[in-house]
């Protein structure tokens, strides 16, 4: 998005443009081809869902044509995850490419080790403790029977905020802390759902449902690039991005991540 005369203006292409993405299925194909894709325009021209879609359909509420609604459609496939992965901005990463981001963003650390070494904040730990068992290592979990090991493998955003003690009279900077955990690839969005009232009726805006990437795809898959240095993973991500945006400046490519 760009600002013109104090107003945010969506970028994009006309519906009839041959490069325009028209459906969640088409977007899923593009994400799997690229490996990863931010939602909104960034330092690299053309590298976003925004710039590949018709701006007039955003926030229309029509799942068939609204890219905002496609977030839920795509994450529910279990093949692609969503979160604030790109310079604190939201976007998608495919199952194939997530291990590269995990190794690069985590700098080779599982969360517990990161926290023990003083590289993660107290507030981050409050949130992660909701998802991590205190006596079972992630590598030892049978992910086909996840609920036998973990009480809450997934939680709504509002549940995370409440259970971790954020909000009025409690811990501050919930949004910033959750964004940091996503940027470090420890926390991801697996779906968006509305709240349900006592009658079982959905209401309000759709809420993000958070989980650990290990709970989506297993510890072995998420950490499979730990065998290489974070710098190697970073370089492979840049090489992949450069393949589709060969004219972009290297520094812009780095900033977009």
Tell me what each language-model feature is.
Residues 1-257:
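Long, low-complexity intrinsically disordered regions
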């Amino acid at each position: 998005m760009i600002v013109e005369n104090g107003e945010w203006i969506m970028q994009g292409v006309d519906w009839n443009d041959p490069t325009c993405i028209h459906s969640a299925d088409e977007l899923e194909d593009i994400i799997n081809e690229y490996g990863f894709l931010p939602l909104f325009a960034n330092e690299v021209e053309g590298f976003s869902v925004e710039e590949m879609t018709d701006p007039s359909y955003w926030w229309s509420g029509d799942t068939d044509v609204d890219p905002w609604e496609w977030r839920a459609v795509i994450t529910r496939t279990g093949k692609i995850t969503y979160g604030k992965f790109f310079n604190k901005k939201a976007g998608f990463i495919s199952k194939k490419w997530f291990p590269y981001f995990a190794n690069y963003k985590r700098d080779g650390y599982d969360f517990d080790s990161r926290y023990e070494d003083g590289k993660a904040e107290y507030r981050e730990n409050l949130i992660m403790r909701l998802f991590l068992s205190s006596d079972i290592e992630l590598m030892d979990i049978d992910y086909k029977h996840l609920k036998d090991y973990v009480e809450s493998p997934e939680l709504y955003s509002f549940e995370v905020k409440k259970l971790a003690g954020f909000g009025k009279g409690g811990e501050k900077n919930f949004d910033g802390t959750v964004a940091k955990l996503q940027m470090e690839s420890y926390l991801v969005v697996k779906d968006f759902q509305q709240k349900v009232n006592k009658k079982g009726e959905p209401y309000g805006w759709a809420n993000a449902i958070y989980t650990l990437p290990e709970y989506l795809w297993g510890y072995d898959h998420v950490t499979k690039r730990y065998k290489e240095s974070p710098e190697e993973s970073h370089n492979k991500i840049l090489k992949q991005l450069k393949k589709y945006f060969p004219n972009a400046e290297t520094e812009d490519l780095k900033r977009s991540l």
